[in-house]
Amino acid sequence: MDSQEMIRLTQTVKKGGCAAKLPAGELKEVLAGMKPFRPKELIVGTETMDDACLWDLKDGRYLIQTLDFFTPIVDDPFDFGAIAAANAISDVYAMGGEPATAMTILAFPGGTLPLSLIRPLMDGALSVLSKAGVALAGGHTIDDETLKLGFSISGFVEKNKAWTNAGARPGDVLILTKGLGTGTITAALKKGEAQDSWIQGAIKSMITLNNITRHLKEIDIHSATDITGFGLAGHATQMALASQCTFYLDLNSLPFLEGAEECLEKGYLTRAHTTNANYTNDKTHWEISTQKESHWPEWKRKVVYDPQTSGGLLLALPEGEGQRALEIIKSLGFTQAQIIGKAKASENSTALRFNAI
């Protein structure tokens, strides 16, 4: 067994993947009142906490720019590289665009890990970048105490095909394209308590590109976001508020990965489960009656706060196009995709209502 095979990357960090994000509520509070330079070409910036920025190229297209990086969420360096790439690219798909170039962001603990690990990390990333048709154009590395890998991604979208998280309309149906549960499953992995089938299922989900945009060009997608570190509740809240809607979500329609139920029931949680709940609690309403109590196991409530890494897209679109869109998405291999709710007129500060369709 060589030195690489003996290293479990998850044991080198305290938290991994998008669960390592700073708490959304605290971050929003700290950044409140900032007034960055805002030229007219910047169409989407920081105001709605969207997945990427849109810059008007004045040729009928927007430039999409985003970046994402994080610490290891799995033990294998190839898998970690692939997940980091898929996660970064996802933001471009969430804006309705196609990715074009990538720049690497790598912090590497050269004093504690062999530099030879960098090659499988990048090989994994390249396997996904190449599949997405993304050119790796450069990058930057530093020596750091903790391994971190990510990418800055640039892409393009036609102006009339761009998606944002601010366009959902009352009456829209909401489609989620991937199952939930990567946060709790990888928390169990870190403790050595996750079954191999759970781990492999989560990895397969995380390295799956959200490249459905080109296949939905004939569907009138009103709004979109990708579900990552703030969980379904956090990102759906941002989308609902940005769209001035209230989202009615059916807890029993939510798709989840194999092992998510068992891991949540056994208490394999991250700090993000708590911070995501804190961020959304005052904007969320749970409709529970004594008669329904048996249908609301505690793990199903926790799964909406589960921090996803390279999670699915949440799409808002006209109800009449919902089934057609769902069939297209499922035909592309997203077998867990589901219609999980509806958008309705805004109810003051309530962004989400669970099990109230």
Description of each model-found segment:
Residues M1-A94, R169-L174, G179, S197, ...:
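N-terminal glycine-rich phosphate/pyrophosphate-binding loops that anchor nucleotide-derived ligands
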Residues C53-I64, I207-T213, Y279-S294:
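Acidic-glycine-rich active-site phosphate/pyrophosphate-binding loop
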Residues P77-M103, P120-K131, T208-D220, T225, ...:
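Small-aliphatic-rich amphipathic alpha-helix that forms the alpha element of a beta-alpha
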Residues G16, G111-S116, A162, E193-K204, ...:
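Flexible, glycine/proline-enriched loop segments at strand-loop-helix junctions
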Residues S152-K161, S197-L216, W296:
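Active-site glycine-rich loop that binds ribose-phosphate moieties when present
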